[in-house]
Amino acid sequence: RCIRDSLRQALREVATSGELDSLLRYQPHRGRPQDRASIARHLRRRGITPDADQILIVNGAQHGLAVTVMAALNAGDVVAVDALTYPGFKVLAHAFHLDVEPIPTTADGPDLDAFEQLCATRPVRALYTMPTLHNPLGWVMSATDRTRLIEIARRHGPLIIEDAAYAYLVEDPPPPLAASAPDITVYVSGLSKSVATGLRVGFVVAPTSRVPSLERAIRATTWNTPALTTAIACRWIEDGTVDQLEAQKREDAKARQALARRELAGLPLIGHPSSYFTWVPLPDDARADRLTATLARQHISVSTAEPFTTSKRTPQALRLALGSTDLDSLQSTLRTVRRVAIEDGYA
């Protein structure tokens, strides 16, 4: 059953459920108790077991990150982030005047020696991290590295902000940081990536002591997430639609990643086997901006490293999004990318 059919069915069920009037009223800032209970059950399949009282429903994961920053940090606070990271967090850091400290990355995750050294020399208030399918590099931190990261955080005191937006794409990953360190971790995720981008339903799982300040931030920014969309999302959680859609997307992403590796043979690719994006590092003397401009003239949009970079030096690289078109069009597009790269001497 396609998502349009699922949506039609859910709308009919909501319309005849007898709760439509209540769904159109103001709701508790952190969401209705029954909806938070549904999300708690969903999160158990992600490897964490929060109480419903630890969950706050938000308008997507980006809103979840925003209210976390509002609730936990102040202007000038030092925040550790990967040297290449999600651009949406960079936007928040700039808007809230945070002091961003980049952590070098390895092939498998953040350089934990560098993170520990940073914590020893600067008053790091928070670490923003994507341990399960990093954007843009696609790595999944090992269980050993997760344990060490938590040990460093416990020694030095920073809050861990765990972004799990893409975690659904990884089968059987190590447990989230929030599973091992729920008292020092705020876990942020949502259904926009895994179900539908227009379904702006996200969730924050926080230590109980931080829930009131997060709730105030939700009140200040949106009052509450619309109960109508939350009700649809929770119906899909309960009837298995979310699990089905996530499984379909994992298989689709695997097919797209495999296609990219075939069509871009000769280019160095970095990415998870079930990721919807891949990273193409270029030589230091390359001009990624020139490549993107050439591709743009052929109606192909790719990104340089600049939006993802938090360090002073921007590496020469491209990020290719693989999920925005059908497979036939993607194949043609990838062939064009490879041809342009070859013409410029990069493959």
Regions found by a protein language model. Give the residues of each.
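Hydrophobic residues in beta-strands of the RecA-like P-loop NTPase core, especially within AAA+ ATPase
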Residues: 81, 161-162
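Short hydrophobic/aromatic beta-strand micro-patches
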Residues: 205, 279-281, 321-323
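Structural signature of PLP-dependent enzymes
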Residues: 214-219, 237-261, 285
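PLP-dependent enzyme catalytic core of the Aspartate aminotransferase-like
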Residues: 297, 311-347
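Conserved glycine-rich beta-strand-loop-beta hairpin in the small C-terminal domain of fold type I
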Residues: 250-261, 269-282, 291-294
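Conserved core of the PLP fold type I
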Residues: 2-6, 11-156, 167-186, 343-345
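Active-site PLP attachment segment
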Residues: 7, 179-213, 225-228
